[in-house]
């Protein structure tokens, strides 16, 4: 998020001095959203008191509140919002009794979050990234040209601080809103499954696929522009090397690099977490279907046994010959691997099986480093592990090793801001970029 120039005591004293207080019950929040919606339809951005009362009357009807005291309650709500600095009131001697109201920046910020920011748009994100790329390219070119302190402030620092950083904050806010929407979708799915899971299957599938598609769309757009943005930031950082007077530019560049890395990293992590949740829901549905079938069969069998003397029956079973997979003799003579596509369920079970076994074994072996307080070099440890598995398993094993290693501790070198060197971990070109973990 944006960095603040004020300290915590200064902000606390400022809030106390101005007596800031916000209380927005659901009906008042709905009233504020109605004001913002109607205000957006006006070119001048102004509303009269009568228009505010009409908006309040509509909200009051929606909440089934009394119609007899609408005018009085509307007047109280308007005065309360003016007092909370959500609305500004303007009066004049020429038009006494007819005040003009405008939303304050605080009111716009609250309504913008609830109305505009919740509307995810790939086009909007693409335009934001396009603007960021243009601003970064211009700043990188200005940094390569060099100049006096005024040149660096105007052509490098200002675009980074007041354009790039703000757009990064907007993208970060979009991700946080997506996090909240994911939780709402999970709640909706839980309610659907608790009511009637048979009727809820199609609705759950729709919610899962829509959320997965939105997350993937967001991440693909970010990754497509991420490398280019990082390259421009590195150019600016290289231009400031050896210049002690440009520490403010170097610090801002480092903050932007960290923010961009965090945005892209969290986007991928959110996708991984959602995939895990998606599989969990499908596993629950499959289990529910199996349990339901077994329950129906057991109930019918119990009734048949109880009513045997009234309605005798006979049980017939068949044991068919097993089907053998016969392959062509020519295929056995070839030295090619004959494979086929596994169903997604089997692939998931196969991955879970190896993950559970390896995770426990790797966790026990890596704990030795923490107990002995020995530095843990991921490149060396991963190379030793990967030699024990076929090439097809290298990615899964490496991922498990990294997951278990980062739980043990951190590398002090990560706090220096310098990137780690790429180290090979197998004989097929795979590499890892990680500092030595030395703080547990």
UniProtKB/Swiss-Prot annotation:
Q: Which domain of life is it from?
A: Bacteria
Q: What does this protein do?
A: Involved in chromosome condensation, segregation and cell cycle progression. May participate in facilitating chromosome segregation by condensation DNA from both sides of a centrally located replisome during cell division. Not required for mini-F plasmid partitioning. Probably acts via its interaction with MukB and MukE. Overexpression results in anucleate cells. It has a calcium binding activity.
Lineage summary: Bacteria, Pseudomonadati, Pseudomonadota, Gammaproteobacteria, Enterobacterales
Protein's name in the database: Chromosome partition protein MukF
Q: Listed GO cellular component terms? A: cytoplasm; nucleoid
* Gene Ontology MF terms in the entry: calcium ion binding
Name of the gene encoding the protein in the UniProt record: mukF
User: What CDD domains does the database record attribute to this sequence?
Assistant: MukF_C, MukF_N
| Leucine-zipper: annotated segments | 208-236
Going by the UniProt record, its keywords in alphabetical order are: Calcium, Cell cycle, Cell division, Chromosome partition, Cytoplasm, DNA condensation
The UniProt entry's GO biological process terms, in alphabetical order, are:
cell division; chromosome condensation; chromosome segregation; DNA replication
According to its UniProt record, where is this protein located? Cytoplasm, Nucleoid
**Predominant subcellular localization, coarse grouping:** cytoplasm
